[in-house]
Amino acid sequence: MAVDPRVLQQEAEKTLASASKGWGLFGNKEDKYQNAADQYIQAANAFRLQKSNTEAGKCFEEAAKIFTEKLKEPNDAANAMLDAFKVYRKDAPDNAVRCVEVAIKQYTMAGNFRRAASHKENQAEVYENELQNKPEAIKAYTTAAEWYENDGAVALANKLWLKVADLSALAGDFFAAIEKFEKVAEASLGNNLMRYSVKEYFLKAGLCSLATKDMVTAQRNITKYAEKDPSFTGQREYQLLVDLLEAASNNNLEMFQDKLAAYDKMSRLDDWKAAVLLQIKNNFEEADNEFS
């Protein structure tokens, strides 16, 4: 028969109260605090079995509080807060990002930036997916990418720079997106395993350039990409950018749509590209309104 998690929680509360009232002779007080923390963790896991995730998170937080304030065990506290993050993630994402931040600070204070980066990435995912908070997701992904980069984990950093670029573009910050796409493209040019993806990064950077409505800069950027990777000029992605630049420069919406339709038949446009292309299309309509 499964143990009632509320009974375990009450036992933890009683043990904690007993420790707080005791005199601490012969180390008894510290043992009681440790027992209380262990009981809270047992209660948390029992709540998890019942899928009572919010209650589980609260018990993990109580254990972390004891580890921090009574036992002076910051690593144990960080582990408890990570467990709280996991159970809060779906049901209480605001609590999840708060709890994991405590663990992240502990790892950075200890100089363990690789581990901190991994959990900062997890926090960013919650901001992006559960909380739908693009600005905070961008900030968290950026921090994680910087920590990975400083730790020499270039591939992990680049994966997150691409997330920053994607989200920045969807948030309307096309210049920031261009910068990050170009950064990853440059890093990938000298890597045989990553080189195939360069055309995708240049395409995305080029689309963001077109979305800024600055056709002079867009022309310069597209030319720059061809110079950095001459093989890019033989790719469909390059030809699409050239065609869309011509259409945008001449405010030719029909050409824009025809070239997109032709490309889409060969290489299906994903949701991100569709969103940025919609912004470019809207720029055509704004130009029409200015001259009407």
From Swiss-Prot:
UniProt keyword annotations, A-Z: ER-Golgi transport, Membrane, Protein transport, Transport
GO BP annotations listed: autophagy; intracellular protein transport; SNARE complex disassembly; vacuole fusion, non-autophagic; vesicle fusion with Golgi apparatus
Pfam families assigned to the protein according to its UniProt record, in alphabetical order: SNAP
GO molecular function, one term: syntaxin binding
Name of this protein: Probable vesicular-fusion protein sec17 homolog
SUPFAM superfamilies tied to this protein: TPR-like
Chief place where the protein resides: membrane
TM segment ranges: none
Native organism: Neurospora crassa (strain ATCC 24698 / 74-OR23-1A / CBS 708.71 / DSM 1257 / FGSC 987)
Function, in words: Required for vesicular transport between the endoplasmic reticulum and the Golgi apparatus.
Cellular component GO terms, alphabetical: cytosol; SNARE complex
UniProt-annotated location(s): Membrane
Top-level taxonomic group: Eukaryota
Membrane protein topology class: Peripheral membrane protein
Similarity remark: Belongs to the SNAP family.
